């Protein structure tokens, strides 16, 4: 039975491997990059574009050409894929791959009103937009293998805790080092209405979470116009404004809540849905939010 190739060319095609290392190499540096040519394949480029009897050329870790008729480089290793398909990989846009999960502190019967964090940060522990996933990312070979078996080639990973959660990183699922797997260190901002592991008393309700988000945006706007103090949380809100904004909702009712925040502060949100959007489909559609929808296939 012919080996069927699942090539992750949607990722490799825009990811360039630099010839210069940023860390020491034990032994002789290997600069040779083998060339693999896959011929006679049905290549799916996008939902609306495909090539029959196509040829795909890979040099090292980078796709250098895809077409129906290409000149094959001398010395290339040729793979005849007649009858086989080559697809782009999936990308998980809502993952915490390679990151440690946030942990709750020890229980105390006394209510906590002040933040226990030290430093020039926001006064509420659930607001931490300064968190940068790329600074905490560690390649996880076991988890990566599970992803790869299901057709994923990359993930957008962030710390899934808090209300303003910080930035996520776009990373490859290879066994290589963190230096090579991180494609975009800061790829998106993440939000939710859940306070997460914070033990502070506030916010204690959904209304409180909404108020805290609005107040944070207003404070960040004020902060941008002053130079008397430093607040790393407000600075992160302002510095990362141009990134995509992904908001995780708890249920279908949250769409209207996020919509009001988006209108007030002129923010374009992408919604990470929960699969219950069908119950208020007209209201959800009216927001015109791009939505990341979970898939749950039946067990075969």
Task: Explain the meaning of each model-derived region.
Residues 49, 68, 100-105, 167-169:
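Short, solvent-exposed loop/turn and secondary-structure capping segments
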Residues 1-25:
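Bacterial Sec-dependent N-terminal signal peptides
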Residues 21-23, 28-29, 34, 43, ...:
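Histidine-rich, glycine-flanked metal-binding segment
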Residues 140-269, 277:
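Polyanionic/metal-chelating signatures
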Residues 262-268, 285-292:
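Glycine-enriched alpha-helix->loop->beta-strand junction motifs that scaffold or abut catalytic
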Residues 276-286:
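Active-site-adjacent beta->alpha loops and helix N-cap segments on the catalytic face
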Residues 274-276, 295-299:
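Short, acidic/turn-prone active-site loops that include or flank metal/cofactor-
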